[in-house]
């Protein structure tokens, strides 16, 4: 779908795009193809798409994969997509009555994606997330999907450049923080490419980037320690320039923290931004959940 087609559809239907919903639609065909290539799709793949908009990426996903679940919050766009795919389904049936329409592989859901993910007890481990995520909810959606063995096997997400850089960051990087660690606990960053702002309509104020994340083959932590990891990370970065040990004293006894820091060869003066993911994992394993001053 080209830019002039997008404009024509929106004008014809009287749809004014809403900034609060992060509605910036990717129209550049070269960038769309790069996203599809990065997803490494096969006809057996199941794909979750969040925020399909007018459906340019959806069309390519249906060509390459076996099943697509597209979740759209804006009812005006859902109405357009249903009409569009119903018309294509009828046209396809007329041309090839014995060949299944690709539309039959599409499930279009009118819902708030973040609410859906929070309440949907689905195992996503056989799915891939391939989406141009709305800026306003991209980070919480990724954290919600980082759920251990139920997490998607691959994420190919187009995001605001700043968010993408956080996902790819390493310790001692300005972009390194809570989002980095909560997502990288389950996913290994593979690659990133920049998508200029003028590839979207309307053009956002900043560039975007597409990141590729693969789910880790082996979990870094057992499920029963995930909540403790989250607590440690959030507490450690609550004041990122402050010494970690002082912050963690709010949750664990000082004597235990000093002993664990010494065992792991972490300086008592160290700040959270200096610790690697592996060090946070080791810290989580070494601190006794039973000695917590408050509940997880």
Regions found by a protein language model. Give the residues of each.
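Catalytic cores of RNA-modifying enzymes
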Residues: 1-234, 262, 273, 277, ...
């Amino acid at each position: 779908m080209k830019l002039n087609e997008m404009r024509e559809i929106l004008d014809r239907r009287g749809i004014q795009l809403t900034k609060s919903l992060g509605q910036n639609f990717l129209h550049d065909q070269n960038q769309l193809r790069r996203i599809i290539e990065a997803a490494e799709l096969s006809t057996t793949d199941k794909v979750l798409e969040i925020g399909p908009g007018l459906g340019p990426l959806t069309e390519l996903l249906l060509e390459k994969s076996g099943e697509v679940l597209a979740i759209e919050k804006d009812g005006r766009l859902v109405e357009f997509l249903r009409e569009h795919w119903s018309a294509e389904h009828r046209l396809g049936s007329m041309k090839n009555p014995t060949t299944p329409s690709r539309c039959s592989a599409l499930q279009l859901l009118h819902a708030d994606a973040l609410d859906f993910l929070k309440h949907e007890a689905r195992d996503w481990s056989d799915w891939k997330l391939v989406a141009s995520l709305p800026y306003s909810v991209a980070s919480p959606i990724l954290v919600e999907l980082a759920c251990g063995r139920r997490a998607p096997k691959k994420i190919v997400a187009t995001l605001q450049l700043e968010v993408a850089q956080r996902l790819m960051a390493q310790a001692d990087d300005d972009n390194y923080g809570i989002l980095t660690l909560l997502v990288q606990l389950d996913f290994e960053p593979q690659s990133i490419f920049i998508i200029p702002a003028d590839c979207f309509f309307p053009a956002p104020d900043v560039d975007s980037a597409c990141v590729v994340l693969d789910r880790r083959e082996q979990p870094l932590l057992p499920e029963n320690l995930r909540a403790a990891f989250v607590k440690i990370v959030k507490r450690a970065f609550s004041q990122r320039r402050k010494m970690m040990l002082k912050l963690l004293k709010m949750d664990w006894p000082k004597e235990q923290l000093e002993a664990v820091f010494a065992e792991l060869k972490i300086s008592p003066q160290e700040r959270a931004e200096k610790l690697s993911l592996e060090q946070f994992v080791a810290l989580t394993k070494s601190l006794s959940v039973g000695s917590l001053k408050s509940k997880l």
